[in-house]
């Protein structure tokens, strides 16, 4: 075990549309199936008037409850409400989004009759809790430690927010790793037996909501990322959107009605489009069939693979740009790539594959790893390495990842002065000496940015802090050392020191951009606990209700059984029948009763039925072997297999 008495460490691929969890066990990675038997779980959370649903249960009811079912939290995490991508997504999401403090997007849902607000971190934490529970059910132990993956092109705020989601979920996030790098581990272990010497591998990871390309060299268990590129807002969902818009227009043309204002109709259409998209990866044509889509109108429409490709061709072509950029940054020629590895469900689209094959001059693509599971697989390996589990096969692996965006600070005139170039191997540390811009300047404002543009206003402000107390001096005399330090999670710390006075100040890039404070996270952790106990309460209630229902129906069947019914005295039989009918009526009228009410009802019913049934068996005339006596208080099993008759010595 992890040597910490906390069960093994797990690897979680927290995806935009689906998530997946793996663990290192018996010298290999086990990808764990959920309670529905699926190895990937929808990244959906639904709120109803009586409970909270996560995963398959949430996605399955989305058409009935579109406005309170939240998905795509990954497209919100670490972003501002005013972000252009958030604004374009709002038009497509059925749930309500509002701007919270510091422009943080907040999701508004109705839960148990009250309006509640959740941040993207909280929604993501609920999915992480679900993934942890899936692993705990399989392993039979509690789990504390996890490695969580993020798109390689996630920026600092998105990484930090994902880490916060882990904290809210009560997990110790040992490491945040990049998805393509995790997939490369899966590829490397898969190929280990056969490969000799250095290999240049391009990982092409096109998922439900994000897109990454990473170029690595792999040799003898050393995975070195040379360059990474991508788009944190491009994936399968965008292809679905194009198809949905196409059919909304089609419906308008055929029926002169606009369904775009009806969340339920749109959701049913989207589900059908997602299914059609998958079908078109293996066949050339399919039909969308939805009964009573809108105003009682049935919608049947064919779609061909060619039409689907035409609707998305600009997006598919857009997928090739990061591939070129990645090769340029790594200063490599496309002919020097040994393997092109497909990761993410959207790489099953034939057109995407064809464009890649054409780009690499007819080179065959590597499809030997499972595109849905490779990322969780790699995360599970990394979790095993970090917790000292696993055999020598994995303990010798070394991961050298890079930072995806250049980091620097603003100098006079709004110029971006870069300290750490993009694609620098992490962890890394860089120092540079700056000075004051005007005479007797008492302090300097250090503004930290990430991005590739020459002017800071075109880049992303990560945070700022003041270094004050500089003694009066002419401009250019004070010496201020600024140090940028990136840890293994790709998260940045910046410190500044005035050489003459020894004045210091530092910042872990946090609160400036809607980052959660320690207190907020603590509060969310407590809320997560509260929701968990509410979920458990609800489950208890459902179990108690089912137990009562089963008992009543089984008892009814028992006395209707001729063999038993005829052995009962008339008034006894009537007594049981009346009490059962009363119980069933009560059940129908009180579906939402409390757990203890169901339990009391159950006891009341048992106190009437059990003695009568027991008396009958004591007569020794029942079909079974006659027992010398009967335990009066035998409770029926909660599973409700009817009155449980035990032999007593």
Curated annotation (Swiss-Prot):
GO terms for molecular function: ATP binding; ATP-dependent protein folding chaperone; mRNA binding; protease binding. The keyword Nucleus applies. GO terms for biological process: response to heat; response to virus. Keywords: ATP-binding, Chaperone, Cytoplasm, Nucleotide-binding, Nucleus, Stress response. Induction: By heat shock and by cold. Up-regulated by virus infection. It comes from the Eukaryota. The keyword Coiled coil does not apply. Interacts with GDP-mannose 3,5-epimerase and SGT1B (via SGS domain). Binds to the deubiquitinating enzyme AMSH3. Interacts with WPP1. Interacts with DEK3. In cooperation with other chaperones, Hsp70s are key components that facilitate folding of de novo synthesized proteins, assist translocation of precursor proteins into organelles, and are responsible for degradation of damaged protein under stress conditions. This is Heat shock 70 kDa protein 3.
């Amino acid at each position: 075990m992890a040597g910490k008495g906390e069960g093994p460490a797990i690897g979680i691929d927290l995806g935009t549309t689906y998530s997946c969890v793996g663990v290192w066990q018996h010298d290999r990675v086990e990808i764990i199936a959920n309670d529905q038997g699926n190895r990937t779980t929808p990244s959906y959370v639904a709120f109803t008037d009586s409970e909270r649903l996560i995963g398959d249960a949430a996605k399955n009811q989305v058409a009935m409850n579109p406005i309170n079912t939240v998905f795509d939290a990954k497209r919100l995490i670490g972003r501002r409400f005013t972000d252009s991508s958030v604004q374009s997504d709002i038009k497509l999401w059925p749930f309500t989004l509002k701007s919270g403090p510091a422009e943080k997007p907040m999701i508004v849902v109705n839960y148990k009759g009250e309006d509640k607000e959740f941040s993207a971190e909280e929604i993501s934490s609920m999915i992480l809790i679900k993934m942890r529970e899936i692993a705990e059910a399989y392993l039979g132990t509690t789990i504390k430690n996890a490695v969580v993956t993020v798109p390689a092109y996630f920026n600092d705020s998105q990484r930090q927010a994902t880490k916060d989601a882990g904290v809210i979920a009560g997990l110790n996030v040992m490491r945040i790793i990049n998805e393509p790098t995790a997939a490369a581990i899966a590829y490397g272990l898969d190929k280990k037996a056969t490969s000799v010497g250095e290999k240049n591998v391009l990982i092409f990871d096109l998922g439900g909501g994000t897109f990454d390309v990473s170029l690595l060299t792999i040799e003898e268990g050393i995975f070195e990322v040379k360059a990474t590129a991508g788009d944190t807002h491009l994936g399968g969902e965008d292809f679905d959107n194009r198809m949905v818009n196409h059919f909304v227009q089609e419906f308008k043309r055929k029926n002169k009605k606009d369904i775009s204002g009806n969340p339920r109709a749109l959701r049913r259409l989207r589900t059908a489009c997602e299914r059609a998209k998958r079908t078109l990866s293996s066949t050339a044509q399919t039909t969308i069939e939805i009964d009573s889509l809108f105003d009682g109108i049935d919608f049947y429409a064919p779609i061909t693979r060619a039409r689907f490709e035409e609707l998305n061709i600009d997006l598919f072509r857009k997928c090739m740009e990061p591939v070129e950029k990645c090769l340029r940054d790594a200063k490599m020629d496309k002919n020097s790539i040994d393997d092109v590895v497909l990761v993410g469900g959207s790489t099953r689209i034939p057109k995407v594959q064809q464009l890649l094959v054409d780009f690499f001059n007819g080179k065959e693509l590597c499809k030997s790893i499972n595109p849905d599971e490779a990322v969780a697989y790699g995360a599970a390996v990394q979790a095993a390495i970090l917790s000292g589990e696993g055999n020598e096969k994995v303990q010798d692996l070394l991961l050298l990842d890079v930072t995806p965006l250049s980091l620097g600070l603003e100098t006079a005139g709004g110029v971006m002065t870069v300290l750490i170039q993009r694609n620098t191997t992490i962890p890394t540390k860089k120092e540079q000496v700056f000075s004051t811009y005007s005479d007797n300047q008492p302090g300097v404002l250090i503004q930290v940015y990430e991005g590739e543009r020459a002017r800071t206003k075109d880049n992303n402000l990560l945070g700022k802090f003041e270094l004050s107390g500089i003694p009066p001096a002419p401009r250019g005399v004070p010496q201020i050392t600024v140090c940028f330090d990136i840890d293994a999670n790709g998260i940045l710390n910046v410190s500044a020191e005035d050489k003459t006075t020894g004045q210091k100040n530092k910042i872990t890039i946090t609160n400036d951009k809607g980052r959660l404070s320690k207190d907020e996270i603590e509060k969310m952790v407590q809320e997560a606990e509260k929701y968990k106990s509410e979920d458990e309460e609800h489950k208890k209630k459902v179990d108690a209700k089912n137990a009562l229902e089963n008992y009543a129906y089984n008892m009814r069947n028992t006395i209707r059984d001729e063999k038993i019914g005829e052995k009962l005295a008339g008034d006894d039989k009537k007594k049981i029948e009346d009490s059962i009918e009363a119980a069933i009526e009560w059940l129908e009228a009180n579906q939402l009763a409390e757990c203890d009410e169901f339990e009391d009802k159950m006891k009341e019913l048992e106190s009437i039925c059990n003695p009568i049934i027991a008396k009958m068996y004591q007569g020794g005339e029942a079909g079974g072997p006659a027992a010398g006596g009967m335990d009066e208080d035998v409770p029926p099993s909660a599973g409700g297999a009817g009155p449980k008759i035990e032999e007593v010595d």
